[in-house]
């Protein structure tokens, strides 16, 4: 084998090892982003909700900064209830329909999948109903979420 071929092979192996160490997003969070996009008809990226207020994104504490943040608090609580039932909300996927009036759960028969679908659809519709305040994106949660 030529030295150049060995270098290419080594580069491929190293890049594959690096890619293997990147944790994948839980499937449900990817699906939830599609449900959000369906509910707001593509007017706002689901990423805009990933770091909004005190509850949108990882974790959550304190008093929600507005109604949109309250949607996230309710969604967190909904996932908490699903976990109490033995479900793993961030790992479950479900079948939903994106109609002209927003997302709906479709033919979801398993209890846990149905609970998670209901949580996600309710949150996405709540996001679409409430105003997005740019001032509440990426806030200092240590100061504002007490």
UniProtKB/Swiss-Prot annotation:
Expressed by the venom gland. Keywords: Calcium, Disulfide bond, Hydrolase, Lipid degradation, Lipid metabolism, Metal-binding, Neurotoxin, Presynaptic neurotoxin, Secreted, Signal, Toxin. Residues 1-21 form the signal peptide. InterPro entries: PLipase_A2, PLipase_A2_Asp_AS, PLipase_A2_dom, PLipase_A2_dom_sf, PLipase_A2_His_AS. It comes from the Eukaryota. GO terms for biological process: arachidonate secretion; lipid catabolic process; phospholipid metabolic process. Its cofactor is Ca(2+). It catalyses: a 1,2-diacyl-sn-glycero-3-phosphocholine + H2O = a 1-acyl-sn-glycero-3-phosphocholine + a fatty acid + H(+). GO terms for cellular component: extracellular region. Its EC number is 3.1.1.4. Binds 1 Ca(2+) ion per subunit. Disulfide bonds join 38-98, 54-145, 56-72, 71-126, 78-119, 87-112, 105-117. One of its GO terms (molecular function) is phospholipid binding. The active site is at 75, 120. Ca(2+) binds at residues 55, 57, 59, 76. It is found in: Secreted. Residues 22-27 form a propeptide. The keyword Iron-sulfur does not apply. Gene3D superfamilies: Phospholipase A2 domain (1.20.90.10). Belongs to the phospholipase A2 family. Group I subfamily. D49 sub-subfamily. Snake venom phospholipase A2 (PLA2) that inhibits neuromuscular transmission by blocking acetylcholine release from the nerve termini. PLA2 catalyzes the calcium-dependent hydrolysis of the 2-acyl groups in 3-sn-phosphoglycerides. This is Basic phospholipase A2. It comes from Hydrophis hardwickii.
